[in-house]
């Protein structure tokens, strides 16, 4: 469908998380913020925890200057209190992500306390912002402490022409690694979501000023200075600002940002700018930066329809999904490494990469980095590809990442976090990894927690999409949708299901356009090869193809009921044999949920290293509760290897595995929520 010109019409949706209602190269659009509400079930429980406990505990963290200067930095920059900047340069963006989450929750519950909380933060942002639209608290605080009036143009303000310097230089864009454009991108998205959720423009006006500043900056900066695209959230932000304002200058900026990448001298694979983007066909470098870039380019494609961009994105997507993505939807295998792309037997061209994609099929488990932000970036990229193509395989990746490698980043009680998401945790590693093995309330690099919070608090906005005559069901969960397919064409639907642990989904039309054919598209997940559909109790003859949509078109009436029942069986999965770390291993998956084994769920206190899964293993479903959260566990009999003592040994003769042991596997997203334990997704296969 690449290159097709599709008009959603002026009557299609707007005010969604993203607004592609006027995008000529998108086939669907988000429902408006607040149009979908979780009414119970899996996502109702998760939303209640994260919109309550997580949101408040994170605000408490931001407000404790002994722990984090997240909010205090804005107060100092605004002149509300004295002090120095403290913390990483990307903290501003992290706070904007938190605010976006609050706005998304407010769109659902209209809680006046949340409105007041947002007003408090926004007031400091507006006061801190420079007259020219620039805002980056490290620089603003430094200027204020030097007596510069940030609300008047001043000759000592560093705006354009600053030399690129060392990392300790504080001027605007003095250091390309200072995450200024990353922060501004999240300001844009927060301002847009806040406006769409509340109708207010206080933060949005600040975002407009910031976008105008970026336009001026990139129009006048030197090529060296223009290389400011670390973790480019601003690509998505600028395109969404164009959609909200219809200012063509913003779309020109978005396109220029892609062009500038091809002009960088001495670029790096780690930052995806060693070669022009239009020459890139494989995923490379820092996985968060990469996925944010791909998402932003997908946004640009939806507006311009440039065929070359879709060729790049499709090739990169195939590279990720078929050679570089974990079974959990996670991305970024390497903590540190050397780029496989930037060298060919030339030592001088060897480049360092970090938190990055590796070589094809390089997917270690114990040392997997898999930063939560990268996994969220994978969601953002695939969501935008779905909007432009309507291809269900993109929605499938959104679901896989969301249920597994995104939810795994936060504890079930919503208070503790992982930065990395490995697929194996062992106490026997003879080295120390950079990040802790247990969930922490606060980690020094606090970018993932607010990103996870906003993603989960916005998940209801991924459930349905529409155009003038079609309703897509993308994510299944107990929910209520109240929207319109255009002016005075109301549509209301309820959904009841035990998903993701039960494959039966019941959709009921509550309000429909009169005497008008509407297409209902039900997504068939990649794992589903058998399902039935009935309408008002009568079976429908449908073709069930994994990674597709089942289309039902008719004049729907209030009271019509659709039952979509997917056969949800437990499956043993193997990896491509080129993935060395998982050769002759299996993973267990049921529906969209990837399972893992924690050592505390092995009878007799045996080690994970001793457990093998029989090829004919029979699994019994078991309802359990961990830390107040209900879920389905899987119980089976495994084989038990006689591993004995490996002290001082690297190799030895193969031992026996003639004993059995009962094991219970839990959803991967739930690991690390009980006592400290070893964990593994992949387990040796016993044939």
Regions inferred by a protein language model and the residue ranges of each:
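Solvent-exposed loop and edge beta-strand segments that line ligand/cofactor-binding
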Residues: 26, 78-95, 111, 148-150, ...
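Catalytic-core region of carbohydrate-active enzymes that cleave or remodel glycosidic bonds
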Residues: 302-323, 363-415
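A surface-exposed beta-strand-loop module
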Residues: 532-561, 570-576
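Well-ordered alpha-helical scaffold segments within catalytic/enzyme domains
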Residues: 41-45, 49, 99-112, 185-200, ...
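C-terminal beta-rich recognition modules with glycine/proline-rich loops and embedded aromatic residues
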Residues: 15, 65, 313, 396-404, ...
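Extended ligand-binding groove/face enriched in aromatic
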Residues: 78-88, 105-232, 236-268
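Beta-strand-rich binding/interaction modules
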Residues: 515-536
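Low-complexity, Ser/Thr/Pro/Gly-enriched N-terminal "stalk/linker" regions
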Residues: 2-3, 13-94, 119-161
């Amino acid at each position: 469908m690449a290159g097709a010109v599709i008009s959603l019409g002026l009557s299609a949706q707007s005010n969604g998380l993203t607004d592609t209602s006027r995008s000529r190269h998108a086939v669907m659009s988000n429902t408006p913020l607040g149009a979908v509400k979780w009414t119970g079930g899996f996502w109702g429980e998760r939303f209640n925890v994260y919109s309550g406990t997580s949101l408040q505990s994170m605000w408490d963290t931001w407000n404790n200057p002994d722990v984090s200067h997240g909010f205090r930095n804005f107060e100092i920059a605004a002149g509300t209190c004295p002090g120095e900047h403290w913390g990483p340069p990307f903290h501003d963006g992290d706070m904007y992500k938190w605010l976006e989450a609050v706005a998304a929750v407010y769109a659902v519950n209209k809680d006046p306390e949340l409105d007041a909380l947002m007003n408090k933060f926004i007031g400091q942002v507006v006061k801190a912002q420079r007259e020219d639209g620039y805002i980056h608290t490290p620089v603003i605080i430094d200027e204020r402490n030097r007596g510069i009036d940030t609300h008047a143009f001043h000759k000592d303000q560093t705006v354009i022409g600053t030399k690129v310097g060392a990392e300790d230089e504080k001027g605007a864009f003095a250091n390309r690694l200072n995450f200024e454009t990353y922060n501004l991108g999240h300001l844009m998205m927060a301002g847009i979501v806040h406006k769409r959720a509340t109708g207010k423009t206080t933060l949005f006006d600040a975002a407009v000023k910031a976008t105008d500043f970026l336009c001026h900056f990139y129009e006048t900066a030197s090529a060296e200075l223009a290389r400011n695209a670390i973790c480019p959230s601003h690509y998505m932000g600028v395109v969404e600002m164009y959609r909200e304002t219809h200012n063509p200058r913003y779309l020109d900026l978005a396109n220029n940002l892609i062009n500038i990448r091809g002009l960088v001298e001495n670029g790096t694979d780690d930052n995806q700018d060693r070669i022009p983007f239009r020459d890139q066909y494989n995923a490379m470098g820092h996985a968060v930066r990469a996925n944010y870039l791909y998402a932003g380019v997908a946004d640009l494609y939806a507006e311009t329809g440039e065929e070359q961009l879709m060729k790049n994105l499709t090739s990169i997507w195939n590279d990720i999904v078929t050679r570089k993505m974990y079974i959990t939807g996670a991305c970024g295998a390497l903590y540190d490494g050397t780029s496989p792309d930037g060298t060919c037997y030339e030592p001088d061209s060897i480049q360092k990469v970090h938190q990055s994609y590796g070589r094809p099929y390089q997917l270690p488990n114990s040392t997997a980095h898999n930063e939560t932000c990268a996994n969220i970036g994978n969601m953002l990229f695939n969501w935008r590809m779905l909007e432009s193509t309507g291809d269900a395989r993109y929605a499938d990746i959104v679901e896989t990442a969301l249920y597994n490698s995104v939810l795994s980043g936060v504890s079930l009680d919503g208070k503790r976090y992982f930065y990395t998401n490995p697929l194996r945790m062992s106490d026997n590693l003879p080295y120390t990894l950079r990040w802790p093995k247990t969930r922490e309330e606060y980690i020094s690099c606090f970018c993932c927690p607010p990103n996870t919070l906003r993603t989960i608090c916005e998940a209801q906005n991924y459930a349905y999409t529409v155009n003038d005559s079609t309703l897509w069901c993308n994510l299944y969960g107990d929910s209520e949708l109240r929207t319109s397919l255009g002016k005075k064409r109301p549509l209301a639907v309820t959904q009841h299901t035990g998903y993701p642990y039960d494959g039966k989904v019941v959709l009921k039309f509550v309000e429909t356009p009169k005497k008008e054919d509407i297409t209902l598209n039900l997504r068939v997940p990649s794992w589903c090869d058998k399902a039935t559909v009935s309408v008002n109790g009568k079976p429908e003859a449908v073709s069930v193809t994994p990674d597709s949509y089942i289309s039902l078109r008719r004049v729907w009436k209030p009271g019509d009921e659709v039952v979509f029942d997917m056969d949800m069986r437990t499956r043993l999965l193997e990896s491509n044999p080129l993935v060395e770390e998982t050769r002759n291993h299996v993973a267990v998956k049921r529906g969209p949920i990837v399972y893992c084994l924690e050592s505390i769920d092995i009878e007799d206190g045996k080690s994970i290293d001793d457990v093998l899964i029989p090829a004919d293993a029979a699994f019994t479903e078991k309802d359990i509760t961990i830390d107040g959260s209900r879920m389905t566990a899987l119980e089976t009999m495994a084989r038990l290897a006689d591993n004995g003592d490996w002290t001082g040994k690297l190799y030895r003769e193969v031992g026996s595995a003639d004993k059995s042991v009962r094991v219970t596997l839990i959803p991967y997203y739930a690991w690390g929520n009980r006592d400290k334990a070893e964990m593994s997704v992949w387990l040796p296969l016993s044939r």
